[in-house]
């Protein structure tokens, strides 16, 4: 994901947040804390999606279909949330269904489309890694952890300029995940499969 952040910086989409006043101690502390959070996220999500779900689906479907279904779950669940926060006195038997409906509407909201596609490609990339490389669950956890950590650090150190002429390369989801990430991971996968074909030739 480093090339993505380099492009975002040089296109002035990511602009250094000059209001932050860092000391070496604060920077290291923040880096370590976010690494711990990122590791936990990577461990849980990869164990679930590329571990339990993908392995289970591979028993019933071709590998490509299993990767696609897993990736759709992975991308969709990132948006399965509701903003409404009803008061205790307002909760009724239908409240849960209302919140669930709002959560599912977030998944199909056109505003989130570029981020959903990018996260779908993240899922496909990790699925290919899981199925093509031995002892790959650890690599998936490592990749996922490093990406989450980089995004968290980027959001702390930089501001996203949504007025940039290149703002279409990112989404409002987190200021990073968007078309640029989707294109980068797609190009990486295409390059990998071309390399695999040339090895067989």
Residue ranges of predicted features:
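Juxtamembrane helix-loop-helix connectors linking adjacent transmembrane helices
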Residues: 1-43, 54-60, 85-108, 166-169
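Hydrophobic/aromatic residues in alpha-helical transmembrane segments
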Residues: 3, 53, 122-126, 186-190
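C-terminal TM-helix exit segments that contain a strictly Trp-centered aromatic cap at the helix terminus
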Residues: 3-11, 76-85, 150-155
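Hydrophobic alpha-helical transmembrane segments
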Residues: 31-44, 101-122, 175-187
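Membrane-interface helix/loop boundary segments of multi-pass membrane proteins
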Residues: 44-76, 80-97, 128-136
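Functionally important transmembrane alpha-helices
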Residues: 68-71, 93-98, 102-169
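C-terminal membrane module of polytopic membrane proteins
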Residues: 143-201
């Amino acid at each position: 994901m480093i090339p993505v952040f380099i492009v975002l910086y040089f296109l002035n989409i990511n602009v250094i947040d000059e209001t932050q006043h860092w000391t070496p101690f604060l920077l290291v502390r923040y880096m370590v804390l976010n690494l711990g959070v990122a590791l936990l996220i990577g461990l849980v999500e990869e164990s679930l999606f590329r571990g339990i779900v993908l392995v289970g689906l591979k028993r019933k479907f071709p590998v490509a279909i299993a990767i696609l279904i897993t990736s759709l779950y992975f991308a969709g669940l990132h948006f399965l949330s509701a903003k409404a926060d009803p008061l205790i006195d307002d909760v009724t038997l239908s409240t849960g269904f209302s919140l669930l409906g709002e959560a599912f509407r977030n998944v199909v909201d056109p505003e989130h489309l570029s981020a959903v596609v990018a996260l779908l490609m993240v899922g496909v990339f990790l699925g290919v890694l899981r199925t093509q490389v031995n002892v790959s669950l650890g690599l998936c956890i490592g990749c996922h952890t490093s990406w989450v950590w980089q995004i968290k650090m980027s959001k702390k150190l930089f501001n996203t300029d949504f007025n940039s002429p290149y703002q279409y390369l990112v989404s409002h989801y987190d200021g990073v995940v968007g078309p640029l990430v989707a294109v980068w991971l797609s190009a990486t996968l295409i390059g990998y499969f071309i390399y695999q074909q040339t090895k067989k030739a």
